[in-house]
C-alpha cells in the first residue's frame, strides 16, 4: 500500500480543479457529491475576478501555486493544454488526472509523462473521460471475453466537446458545435456548425477544420449558422459491440449502450480516477491499467462483498 493511500484513508483527498468550463463546472458538482473529497480550490484564467456565485465558498486563483495542500489536480482544460499543465503540476509533487482525447497521441503522451512522475513520486492518470476512458475499460473486458473477433465503437448522435473546442480555436470562428453521427461499424460522420466572426471566410475555415487531426480521418461537413447557442445540446451516447470467439466457440456477441450528459459523465470519471491516483505507485497510467475497484470510494473488502 502506498504512502499516499495510507494518508488518503486518514483524511479527505484535497482536489484542485484546473479550468472552469463545462467539465470544470460538473467536476465541482461531482466533488461536492463525493464524501471522501474536499475542494482545495479552482484555477481559472481570471482568478477571483468576476467569481461565479456558485464558487463563493471556494478559493479561486490564477495559478495552482496559490492553493494549499493539493493532493490531486483535475485538469478540466482543452486537450491540447493537458500536457503543459500536467508536466508543471506533477513536478510540484501533485498528482494529475485529465480527459485527453486525441486517441492517436495517448501512447506518446503517456511516455512523456512517465519519467516526470517517477522523478517526483507522483501519479498521472491520462485519457480518463468516458471515451477514451471508461469505454476503454469496457472494450478491454469485451476483448478478454472473446479474444478473437472484432469490436466497434459507435458514438452519438451527440455533441463532441473535444471536437467543438477544436473548431472554436480556428481563426474566424466565434462559436462552434461539432456533432458526431454514427454511420456504423465504428465509422462516423462529423457535422460541424460554425458561427463566424465578421469578415471570416467559410471556405478557409472549412479547410482548416478538415485538416486538423481531430477531423482528418472522418467524413466532415461544415455549415455556417447564425447562432450556435440555438443548436446546443450536451447529450451524447455510445454503442460498443464485440462479436468474436471464446476459446473455440464462435458467435459470442457483447453490447454496451449508454445515453449521457457528456460533461457530467466526464467529470464523474475524472473524480473517480483522482481517487484512484492516490492508490497507485508513481507513474503515468491509463484507465485500463488500474484495478477498477480503485475507482470506488470505500473499503476494499466491503466493496468485494457487495459487488462480487
Question: Model-derived features: where do they sit?
Answer:
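C-terminal substrate-binding/catalytic lobe of Rossmann-fold NAD(P)-dependent oxidoreductases
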Residues: 14, 25-26, 33-64, 158-276, ...
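Beta-loop-alpha module in the N-terminal Rossmann-like domain of NAD(P)-dependent dehydrogenases
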Residues: 69-91, 103-107
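N-terminal Rossmann-fold NAD(P) dinucleotide-binding loop
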Residues: 24-25, 82
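C-terminal helix-rich "cap/oligomerization" subdomain common to oxidoreductases
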Residues: 277-308
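N-terminal amphipathic/basic-hydrophobic helices that include classical n-h-c signal peptides
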Residues: 1-9
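Rossmann-like NAD(P)H-binding beta-loop-alpha module
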Residues: 134-154, 162-166, 170
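Glycine-rich Rossmann-fold phosphate-binding loop(s) that bind the pyrophosphate
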Residues: 20-21
Amino acid at each position: 500500500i502506498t504512502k499516499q493511500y495510507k494518508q488518503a484513508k486518514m483524511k479527505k483527498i484535497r482536489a484542485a480543479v484546473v479550468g472552469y468550463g463545462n467539465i470544470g463546472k460538473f467536476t465541482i458538482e461531482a466533488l461536492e457529491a463525493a464524501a471522501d473529497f474536499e475542494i482545495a480550490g479552482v484555477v481559472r484564467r481570471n482568478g477571483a475576478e468576476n467569481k461565479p456565485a456558485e464558487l463563493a465558498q471556494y478559493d479561486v486563483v490564477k495559478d495552482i501555486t496559490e492553493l494549499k495542500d493539493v493532493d490531486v489536480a483535475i485538469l478540466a482544460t482543452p486537450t491540447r493544454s493537458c500536457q503543459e499543465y500536467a508536466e508543471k503540476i506533477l513536478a510540484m509533487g501533485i498528482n494529475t488526472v485529465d480527459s485527453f482525447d486525441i486517441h492517436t497521441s495517448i501512447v506518446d503522451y503517456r511516455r512523456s509523462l512517465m519519467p516526470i512522475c517517477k522523478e517526483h513520486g507522483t501519479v498521472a492518470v491520462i485519457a480518463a473521460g468516458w471515451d477514451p476512458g471508461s469505454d476503454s475499460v469496457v472494450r478491454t473486458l469485451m476483448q478478454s471475453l472473446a479474444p478473437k473477433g472484432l469490436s466497434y465503437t459507435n458514438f452519438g448522435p451527440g455533441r463532441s466537446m473535444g471536437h467543438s473546442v477544436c473548431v472554436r480555436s480556428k481563426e474566424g470562428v466565434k462559436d462552434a458545435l461539432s456533432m458526431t453521427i454514427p454511420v456504423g461499424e465504428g465509422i462516423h460522420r462529423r457535422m460541424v456548425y460554425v458561427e463566424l466572426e465578421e469578415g471570416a471566410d467559410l471556405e478557409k475555415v472549412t479547410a482548416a477544420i478538415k485538416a486538423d487531426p481531430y477531423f482528418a480521418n472522418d467524413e466532415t461537413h461544415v455549415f455556417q449558422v447564425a447562432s450556435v447557442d440555438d443548436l446546443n445540446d450536451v447529450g451524447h451516447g455510445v454503442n460498443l459491440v464485440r462479436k468474436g470467439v471464446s476459446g473455440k466457440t464462435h458467435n459470442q456477441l457483447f453490447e454496451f449502450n449508454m445515453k449521457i450528459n457528456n460533461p457530467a459523465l466526464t467529470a464523474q470519471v475524472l473524480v473517480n480516477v483522482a481517487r484512484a491516483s492516490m492508490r497507485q505507485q508513481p507513474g503515468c497510467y491509463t484507465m485500463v491499467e488500474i484495478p477498477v475497484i480503485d475507482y470506488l470510494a470505500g473499503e476494499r473488502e466491503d466493496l468485494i462483498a457487495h459487488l462480487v
